[in-house]
């Protein structure tokens, strides 16, 4: 690290002087210096840093402002340039250090212009050149900012510029996953694992966990998913999402006892984790332990009152216990936050039917009619119900279709 960081600082300096779009990216692929001569730029970079430090102190009396600007830049890069285990390079770390970077440059330009005070044409030429460079950098900033219009543009750009880094492929996969491009997401996660250029073991675990999610939800292969999730736990036992999703995977496989054991193990390490309590509540719900499921769901909400998903466990647990009123109340509260959630809307259709609440039943059916667009009800349910697993509520497709059909008939 100590050998590599001088090269990184020199790179920061060159970025300030030559910030073209092709050199700017979120994550840079930096070659590690393994000796003073490998790569060859290591020794010259160290020599440049030593020279700048010496120069900063040497001119302190004669030119204190220039001296301060040089030392200010170097001191602000001192933390990352030391033994502190941070990522090697991030462009944003150059923001504060560069505050005074161009003060010496400005002083130099003013002296040059003053030197040619009797040659107005040269002064105009220098001024025009500086103005042109400023406008050119403005254009670079404008084109660079366009990449921030959507995360996909930014991540794809990063993959092009640092194609061998695992993290950039994982980040691209995460964007694909968020946007529903599951096949592309899985391919990106596989690329991240294949390149094996991770920054730390947590990054490896995150990629393995993501591949587990691909196998579980995109591929429908819980056995393969469990293998990836267990590998993630083995690589980094401190990454709690692996435990949570491993327990969900075991639940889908029908290994209820193992799922409960996995989540209990996680809760001993992270007793105040809302998502773990929610996952445990879901497992208890699926095993028919409704009172315990209610307790866990309430614990999840107590730990993080901003979470709404535990309400689905409460709603379904009370429905199973026969308390239709409370079930409806919890589902309606959940839908206040997520009005287009299919699980909640399907659940309320069944509950409104039981309550004989025709007004709310038909309004819910109308909302789903809008969401399904041109698809048939069968296509809509085939596309979307399967994606909800594992969910607190498991809709009966045939029963739902019958209720929806009757709702339309009675309305007409």
Task: Cite the ranges covered by each PLM segment.
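Membrane-interface junctions at the ends of membrane-embedded or membrane-associated helices
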Residues: 105-129
